C-alpha cells in the first residue's frame, strides 16, 4: 500500500487536508465558494457564528474574573492563572477575524498556489515535493498534538479528577469544578443539569479556540512550504541552466519565464502578509506575556497544575518557534535565488541576458518574508527576542510577587 501511495502524484487538496478538515469541525469552510450545496454552507456559517458568540461570552467571563482577581493581592495568583488563557483566546479570536476579513485574499492565494502546484509525479519529484511534504507533516503533527492536548487537559481534567475521587476513592461529593476560571452571572454549579450544560459549553468554546488558533498556523505552514518549494525550484532551474553561448534567444526566453515565475512567488508572499501581518503582531505580543505567566504558574503551583501548564507552555513556545522557523526558511529560500543566478555560467551569455540576470539578482537581495507591522521580518532571531522578553517579564513578576 505504501509503494502504491508513493507512486501517486499528490494533489494540492491532499496537502491542505489537515487545516481544511479541522476548520470544518468548527464551521469554517475555506472552500465554501466552491460548494454546490448552499444549505450545507449556510448551516456551516450558522454553526461557526453561534460558536464564536458563545466563545466570546466565555472570554468576557474570563476578563471579568481577571478584573475581580486583581483587586486583592490575596487573589492575584488567580489573575495570573487566567491571564494566559485570556491571551490564547484573544489571539484565536483575532486570527479568525483576520481569516474572515481577508477571505478574498485567502481564496486568491490558495487558488494561485493550486494552479502552480506540480500535477504529475515526475514534476513533483523535480520540485522535491516529497521532501517538503515530509517536513511539513512532522511540524503539523507535533503542533496539532500539543494544541489539542492543551485544550483537552484544561477542559476535561477537572471532570476526570472529580469522577475518580467520587467513584473510586470514596469521596462523598462530586466536585463541580471547571477547567477554566470564568465568572458567571449565576451559580453555574448549583445542580448537575446546569453544571454539565455549562461544562460542555466551556469544552466546546475551548475546542473552538484551539482549532481557530491551530488552523490559522497550519494554513500558514502549508502556504509557506509551497512558496519555499517554488523558490527552491527556481534556484535549481537557474543553477542547472547550461547558458550555451550559441542559444541566446532560448536563454533570454528561459530567463523571462524565470523572472515571471519569481515575481509570482513574491506576490504570493505579499498576499500572505496581507492576510497574517496584524494577527501575527498580536500573536507575538501576547506570546511574550503568555509564556511569562505560564512559567510563573509552573514555578508556583502544585504538581498537577504544573503538568497541565507545562503542556500549555510547550504549546506556546512551539507555536512561536514554528512561525519563526518558517519565516526564516522563507527568507533563506528567496535569498537562494540570487545565489543560484550568480552561480550560473552567465559569462557565456549575451549582454542583454546578463543585464536581465543582474536585475533578478538585485531583486532577490530583498528577501521575501513575513512582516508584522512595526516588527522586523520574522526569523529565528525573532524567536530569541520573544523568549528573552518573556524571561524578563517573568523575572520581574517573580521578584514583585516575592517582595510582597
From Swiss-Prot:
GO biological process, one term: signal transduction
Tissues expressed in: Expressed in olfactory sensory neurons in the antenna.
Segments traversing the membrane: 46-66, 80-100, 140-160, 205-225, 278-298, 305-326, 374-394
GO molecular function annotation: ionotropic olfactory receptor activity; odorant binding
Ranges facing Cytoplasmic side: 1-45, 101-139, 226-277, 327-373
Domain of life: Eukaryota
This protein's UniProt keywords: Cell membrane, Membrane, Olfaction, Receptor, Sensory transduction, Transducer, Transmembrane, Transmembrane helix
Assigned protein family: Belongs to the insect chemoreceptor superfamily. Heteromeric odorant receptor channel (TC 1.A.69) family. Or49a subfamily.
Subunit relationships: Interacts with Orco. Complexes exist early in the endomembrane system in olfactory sensory neurons (OSNs), coupling these complexes to the conserved ciliary trafficking pathway.
General remark: The atypical heteromeric and topological design of the odorant receptors appears to be an insect-specific solution for odor recognition, making the OR/Orco complex an attractive target for the development of highly selective insect repellents to disrupt olfactory-mediated host-seeking behaviors of insect disease vectors. Odor-evoked OR currents are independent of known G-protein-coupled second messenger pathways.
Protein name: Odorant receptor 67c
Organism, as annotated: Drosophila melanogaster
Amino acid at each position: 500500500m505504501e509503494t502504491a501511495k508513493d507512486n501517486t502524484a499528490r494533489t494540492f487538496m491532499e496537502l491542505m487536508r489537515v487545516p481544511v478538515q479541522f476548520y470544518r469541525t468548527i464551521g469554517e469552510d475555506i472552500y465554501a465558494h466552491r460548494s454546490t450545496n448552499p444549505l450545507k454552507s449556510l448551516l456551516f456559517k450558522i454553526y461557526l457564528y453561534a460558536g464564536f458568540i458563545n466563545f466570546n461570552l466565555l472570554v468576557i467571563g474570563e476578563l471579568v474574573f481577571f478584573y475581580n482577581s486583581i483587586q486583592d493581592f490575596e487573589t492575584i495568583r488567580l489573575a495570573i492563572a487566567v491571564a494566559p488563557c485570556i491571551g490564547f483566546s484573544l489571539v484565536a479570536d483575532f486570527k479568525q477575524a483576520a481569516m474572515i476579513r481577508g477571505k478574498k485574499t485567502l481564496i486568491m492565494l490558495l487558488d494561485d498556489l493550486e494552479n502552480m502546484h506540480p500535477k504529475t509525479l515526475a514534476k513533483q519529484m523535480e520540485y522535491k515535493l516529497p521532501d517538503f511534504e515530509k517536513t511539513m507533516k512532522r511540524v503539523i503533527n507535533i503542533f496539532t498534538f500539543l494544541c489539542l492536548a492543551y485544550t483537552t487537559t484544561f477542559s476535561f481534567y477537572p471532570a476526570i479528577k472529580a469522577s475518580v475521587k467520587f467513584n473510586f476513592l470514596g469521596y462523598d461529593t462530586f466536585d463541580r469544578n471547571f477547567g477554566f476560571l470564568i465568572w458567571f452571572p449565576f451559580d453555574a454549579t448549583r445542580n448537575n443539569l446546569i453544571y454539565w450544560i455549562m461544562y460542555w459549553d466551556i469544552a466546546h468554546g475551548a475546542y473552538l479556540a484551539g482549532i481557530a488558533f491551530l488552523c490559522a498556523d497550519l494554513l500558514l505552514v502549508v502556504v509557506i512550504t509551497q512558496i519555499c518549494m517554488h523558490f527552491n525550484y527556481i534556484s535549481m532551474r537557474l543553477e542547472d541552466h547550461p547558458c550555451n553561448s550559441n542559444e541566446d534567444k532560448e536563454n533570454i526566453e528561459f530567463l523571462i519565464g524565470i523572472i515571471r515565475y519569481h515575481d509570482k512567488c513574491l506576490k504570493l508572499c505579499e498576499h500572505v502578509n496581507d492576510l497574517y501581518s496584524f494577527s501575527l503582531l498580536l500573536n507575538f505580543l501576547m506570546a511574550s506575556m503568555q509564556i511569562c505567566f505560564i512559567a510563573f504558574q509552573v514555578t508556583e503551583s502544585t504538581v498537577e497544575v504544573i503538568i497541565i501548564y507545562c503542556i500549555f507552555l510547550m504549546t506556546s513556545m512551539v507555536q512561536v518557534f514554528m512561525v519563526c522557523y518558517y519565516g526564516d526558511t522563507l527568507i533563506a529560500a528567496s535569498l537562494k535565488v540570487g545565489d543560484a543566478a550568480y552561480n550560473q555560467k552567465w559569462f557565456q551569455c549575451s549582454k542583454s541576458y546578463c543585464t536581465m540576470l543582474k536585475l533578478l539578482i538585485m531583486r532577490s537581495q530583498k528577501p521575501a518574508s513575513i512582516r508584522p507591522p512595526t516588527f522586523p521580518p520574522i526569523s529565528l532571531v525573532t524567536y530569541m527576542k520573544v523568549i528573552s522578553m518573556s524571561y524578563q517579564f517573568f523575572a520581574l513578576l517573580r521578584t514583585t510577587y516575592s517582595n510582597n
